Amino acid sequence: MQTTTITMGDVQYPYRLGTGCVDGIVTRLGELEASHYLVLCDATVAELYGHDLAARLRRSAGPASVLTHPAGEEHKGLGTLDTLADAALHAGVDRRGVVVALGGGVTGNIAGLLAALLFRGIRLVHVPTTVVAMLDSVLSLKQAVNAQVGKNLVGTFYPPVEVLADTAMLGTLPVREIRSGLCEVVKNALAIRPSMIDFLAAELRPDGRYADDVLRWMIDESVAAKAQVTEHDKYERREGLVLEYGHTVGHALEHASHGAVSHGAGVGVGMVAAAEVARRLGHVDADLVELHRELVGKVGVATTLPADVPTEEITYRLGFDNKRGYQPLPADHYAMVLLADVGQPLYQDGLPLTPAPRALVDEVVRELADAPSRIGASVGSAGGAS
């Protein structure tokens, strides 16, 4: 397995990446000498990989249990966390236990917060099974669940002891989840690492089918992009805020859709919205907006909003965006990550955040919902395992 050391301030952990390397994953987990391995996943991932992984751990490492949670963003809440905490304690976990987050971003967030809270902190290992998780969520210390009014509003920062990733697991993903991850790759290219753009313009495929070497390149480049902005900002409160590009409208859409819109698809159209806001504020020209539409469209997701999600539900949730409070703003403004050009976020008061008038942002949201054309697949297309 290829090993990269992830560094965020005083936090370091290894990211081990391979293909067809489940035996290596079991070996690495066994070396942690846990008193109990809690393999946390949704029911679909449990059938694909979870029960097998737990059985292998029981044979070679020690006691192991599979804990499942309901699939979907709509179940990423405190109720699910409470149920899992009770189940973990009844399974026999103690302070020497290890939580194994086996799945996508939803599982990783739930497992991360569970590990942080059990006995005030036990070890966490990410075994990501989606593109979003492999190249985005496991490269962050943020662990959070949703509140009723918005995404990721209840949480903390907690590092894994390591990440163990097998790209062969991506072979069972539905196309929706591949596209979701690729939207985060586009975000990294537009906001942080524009050297990626030409390759992506040539290689992105709306059908979501990629050779393993292309996916490995995207993961490697995304690791490098995140390192650029988090190496000295482990809490993502300064330059790391650029990773929120596209997430203001994206999170609001994802939450308003009750999980029908994937995280990446929300971020995709959220980046288009951010580019259009920046254009209307005079920071970028129409060509940059078109570049956003082109790259997001090539991923295979929509660059406009789905007709079945009421715009008032989206604009309501914009008021609960998780970037509130970083800057003193008038009540009629949102704090948004906006660009001056590719790889050049706009800064104010030392942060990559720009005050954007609510009336303007809400207008852009309404216009994206009213746009007659769609590029690529519907944002709210059916999904699968995460």
From Swiss-Prot:
SUPFAM superfamilies: Dehydroquinate synthase-like. Its EC number is 4.2.3.124. Binds 1 Co(2+) ion per subunit. It catalyses: D-glucose 6-phosphate = 2-deoxy-L-scyllo-inosose + phosphate. Keywords: Antibiotic biosynthesis, Cobalt, Lyase, Metal-binding, NAD. Catalyzes the intramolecular carbocycle formation from D-glucose-6-phosphate to 2-deoxy-scyllo-inosose (DOI). PANTHER family: 3-DEHYDROQUINATE SYNTHASE. This is 2-deoxy-scyllo-inosose synthase.
